[in-house]
Amino acid sequence: EHWAFDYSLDYAYNNLNSSLATDTRPYRNTILQSFTAKYSLSRFTAVARLLHSVYLNDEKEGEGSKNMRRLSPSFSLSYKLLQSHDLFIRASYKSIFRAPTFTESYYYLYGSRDLKPEITKQFNLGITWRQSFSHRMDFEATLDAYINNVKDKIVAVPYNMFVWTHINVGKVLVQGVDASILTSYHLNSRQTISLSGNYTYN
């Protein structure tokens, strides 16, 4: 079979209480729905995913932050370059939606109910090599280049000398390269020794 499909649904309830007189007891209902389609043919694999995020905010003693809804698509492609070796080239695009946390929205003096969600568009191009030198020893190396375009990034800034607050800062561009290696030695079926290293430049 070349096609595979998956659907998942997650629900979460969060609330915040404190002993402060200014506490309005905010709470949030979160609904996340994900639909994934995967297509495989010989050495080629493609995955498409659509995430629907719903954040319903309210307060027991006031007006909560704005409700948030977002459709976030993502796509990834992988191709095995050599039939007899695990050498893959990868490319991906992902839209990431991050709602403000309770601390960023409601924390005493620091929070802001007017925060917009943080939206990131992530582009990635990479290569992966895996090799088994014996039935006990495995090796994996990856190299990735990425670009992240962030809109309405949430950051903490000083409101005065003693108080900080959270704001959206418009657009942020992040570019970089990641390299990693992982070596594993299997002592037996239950015990493995691993050595890993990672380097990031941006």
Residue ranges and their predicted role:
Residues 2-19, 25-61, 65-124, 145-167, ...:
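Surface-exposed extracellular loop regions of Gram-negative outer-membrane beta-barrel proteins
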Residues 25-31, 67-71, 119-123, 137, ...:
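Residues that define the transmembrane beta-barrel architecture of outer-membrane proteins
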Residues 76, 124-128, 180:
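Outer-membrane beta-barrel "beta-signal"
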